[in-house]
Amino acid sequence: MFPTHKSNLLRKHKECSFHSTSCKGIEITKNMAIGSKATILAIGTALPPNIIYQSDYTDYYFNATNSEHLSELKQKLTRICVGSNIQKRHFYLTDEMLKDHPNLATHREPTLDSRNQLLAPGVLNLAKDAAEQALKEWSQPRSRITHLIFHTATGCVDMPGPDFELLNLLGLGSTVNRYMLFHNGCYAGGTVLRLAKDIAENNPDARILAVCSESTLSIFRGPSAANMDTLVGQALFGDGAGAIIIGCNPDLAVERPLYEIISASQSIIPGTSHAVGGRVEEAGFVLFLKPEVPTYITNNIRECLSRVFEPLGITDWNSLFWIVHPGGRKIIDGIENELNLDNERLLATRKVLEEYGNILSGGVIFVMDEMRKRSKKLGMTTTGEGAEFGVLLGFGPGVTIETSVIRSCKSL
């Protein structure tokens, strides 16, 4: 058993009739009205325009870093790319940037200033584009936004931070409450969801804009036989931003509920802090990523799920819809095999991995967007591919697992 922090479990909505069960003194409701919990009201995503297909990436990378002579490493990256199940990725980094900042293509030369100079506008503009998409879908006055949550693990450490800059770019009010989260990593999509849930359920009139924006420019560097983690990172990660708007008690005349956040919790797998993470150095953000990460996650995933679904009496994992961080093929395959999931359960996650790679903290927002669009396209009755309850999973440094119980809404 590993330590955990939980948000509130299900609470009774006074205007609804339902059946309930009692679990350790907490009233658990399975048939609550939509809106009594924090509800996702809009989703937006954004991608930079520069696309590189995975089949071309090895040649691009070794040419860009002047490393064609490292033939063994090139063969290694080719094998990693072929086995990644990624078709293409989007990047903010351009050939012009590499020409103007050639040290970015070296392995460990000091480049922190150059990276920060380039990352600040890139991450911010991606965040703005995703937020604009969410605000457009929500279609309510921006003056109704009361809180802003911004996460990035890829630079932008100025003061005031990108949360301040985004507030001004979007024309939001000067009294909006801001929360800036740095370097949580790939699990942070679940973190912003959990934080937004706590804010919404303690401020019933709140409307929270939560944004995750990332760029791999922070970790782009030349190859080295002494650091294979760098090579894996080059094959796996992509750029993108995701945004969601969250609030309680939606006005159904003008707002459309997409998903309800029933519970949210975070767990750390003991003894795994060495497995994945990074350090900010003069050479930029230096990634470390060990091959044991998928095993750590799959060995602990059942315990995470049992803990949060036991109050609902749910033990059939195939009865759920799945919004899983697209952290890599081995993680996705491991979860599917460990839980004996039907092949279609993780199709939304696999689709996002194929199309965009691992987009770090924004990954689960992209999967959520794919899930609701897929549900509508297939004529499903709910935004969860016809299922009522689902799970959102984020994984990252720690090793940390974010586990959220999600309830779908009617698919329109």
Summary of predicted features, one role per range:
Residues 22-120, 216, 222-299, 303-307, ...:
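Condensing-enzyme catalytic core mediating Claisen C-C bond formation in acyl metabolism
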Residues 35-38, 142-146, 174-177, 203-208, ...:
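Short coil/turn connectors at secondary-structure junctions
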Residues 41-44, 151, 182, 207-214, ...:
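Short beta-strand segments
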Residues 84-172, 183, 316-332:
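Conserved beta-ketoacyl condensing-enzyme motif
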Residues 113-119, 150, 178-182, 229-231, ...:
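A short glycine/serine-rich beta->alpha loop
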Residues 128, 154-156, 160-161, 168, ...:
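Claisen-condensing/thiolase-fold acyl-transfer catalytic domains that form or cleave C-C bonds
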